[in-house]
Amino acid sequence: MFKKSLRQLLLAAAIFPLVVQPAMAHVIWFDYNKGEYDVLFGHPEDGAEAYNPDKFKSVTGYDQNKQIVPVEIKKQSESVSVIPQGDIAALTAFFDNGFFVTKSPGNSENVSESEAEKLNPDFEVGHFLKHTKALYGWSEVLKQPFGLPLEIQALKNPFELKSGELLPVQVLYQGNLLKNPTVEYEGEKYTIDEDGIALVPYVVGGFQPIEASYTLSLDNDPAADRLSYETSFSAERNSVPEPSALLGLSVLGLMAFARKQGKGLKSTK
């Protein structure tokens, strides 16, 4: 009885933040750096944190026609960078942040899948998966979805935005429109209208990555009670996939931010 009551309490404590602020979990995104694309982890408005590079699972590069461009993956002790072997117009990536068990309210611990299976009968366990999409060009094929499990879809060309204009975005789960995702930009949540659209404002200096999250309850998973997807979207002109990129700097890019490099790897969702 005690374990059941404790489990219910922890479940409520774990779900409450998802209701009032479900975008608290970290995201990944790309940051162009002298020919390489650093894979950053954290909250874009706060800066990046160190992470275990083994959690980075895959990356795909695309040219202007959405054909695959080979990429080299460089893993450092607490980060990953990607080097395209040609001009790219888009990058996507997948990061499995693993299982987190909540043993007390507000305190989560990163555990292995086998440990999660042992703990799950008595404690709330979540599995956190991260995806990201970065555009460096725009075309008829690039504006179509890339097939990410959770994906932010821009409904107009972000490179044509002017200061004060809004970028309409939708969030897709398994290719289908979500009506109730959490969309966040610079730490602020944005309202989703009846068509599943959020309007993200352009600000002088460009965009931070836009974030979205969606959480599912799991009934038959021995290791986790819920599956949490986090995804991000960014756009900037770093590669030169089309001649128009030579006309000037992009109106849409990542804002400069101070990276918070941790002294050690953190157990962060």
Where are the language model's segments positioned?
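Short, threonine-centered small-residue motifs that mark membrane-proximal processing/anchoring sites
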Residues: A25, N238-L249
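Short acidic/polar inter-strand loop motif in beta-rich domains
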Residues: D96-K103, S217-N220
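N-terminal signal peptide c-region/cleavage motif recognized by signal peptidases
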Residues: V20-P22
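Short amphipathic beta-strand segments in non-cytosolic proteins
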Residues: S58-I68, P181-T191
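Beta-strand-rich domain onsets/edges
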Residues: H26-E36, E109-L167, L172, N176, ...
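Glycine-centered loop-to-beta-strand initiation motif
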Residues: Q76-S79, I192-G206
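C-terminal cell-surface anchoring/sorting signal
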Residues: L6-R7, A245, L249-K269
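Short, ordered, surface-exposed loop/turn motifs in non-cytosolic proteins
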Residues: Y51-K55, G175-E186
